[in-house]
Design a protein with these regions (language model features):
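Condensing-enzyme catalytic core of the thiolase-fold
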Residues: 1-203
Length: 203
């Protein structure tokens, strides 16, 4: 499929948080080589595939911590809607390549001592990190139908907000989370009672 998109106005949006490969390089005093600068730049997570596959649309890496991939998705949807690109790849990357990750999150009490996530449960004692890479191609629905593409889902609406001032910079705001849900529902022109499944933040 990608070979058919060469030279097209296709965007590339990649959500990522943390930079374990560079962290490991620095911790082990790896000798600097000519590829370290560009090779470790987060922007290259989006720019390299755009370069390699000759994609001409917007190309950017998004880091908004846990929401990175969904914010990348929101930006890609808006870019398609406003004509900045005709379609867009959206990817999410989370690879745990450094022990620093575990040491840090243990030090702030974020990791589950039981090794399990117990969301909305009295047993909740933190979260367990996981790894993965995923990528989807977004197209306007009418074009996907016309092209006979396999359609896995339809994005009806999305929204992005920041929690603003809370107890700490990492503490969520229940009030703002309610606002962003309402905004997403309004954008999608649906009612809350029409929702059949919600995937919540697991921390």
């Amino acid at each position: 499929v990608v070979s058919q998109l060469r030279g097209s106005n296709t965007g590339m949006y990649v959500g990522v948080c943390f930079h374990d490969y560079q962290t490991e390089s620095l911790l082990h005093n790896k000798e600097i080589d000519p590829f370290d600068g560009i090779g470790n730049a987060l922007t290259m997570l989006a720019n390299r595939p755009s370069f390699y596959f000759d994609l001409k649309g917007p190309s950017l890496t998004v880091d908004t911590a846990c929401s990175s991939s969904l914010v990348a998705l929101d930006l890609a949807c808006k870019a398609i809607q406003n004509g900045s690109c005709e379609m867009a790849f959206v990817s999410g990357v989370n690879l745990l390549l450094s022990a620093w990750h575990y040491k840090y999150f243990s030090s702030i009490g974020a990791l589950s001592e039981s090794g399990r996530c117990h969301s909305f449960d009295s047993r909740a004692d933190g979260y367990t990190p996981g790894e993965g890479i995923a990528s989807v191609l977004l197209k306007p629905l009418d074009k996907a139908l016309a092209d006979g593409d396999p359609i896995h889902s339809v994005i009806k609406g999305s929204a992005v907000k920041h929690g603003g001032y809370t107890n700490s910079i990492t503490a969520p705001s229940a009030k703002t989370q309610a606002l962003v849900l309402k905004e997403a529902w309004n954008n999608a022109n649906i009612l809350p009672e029409q929702i059949g499944y919600i995937e919540a933040h697991g921390t």
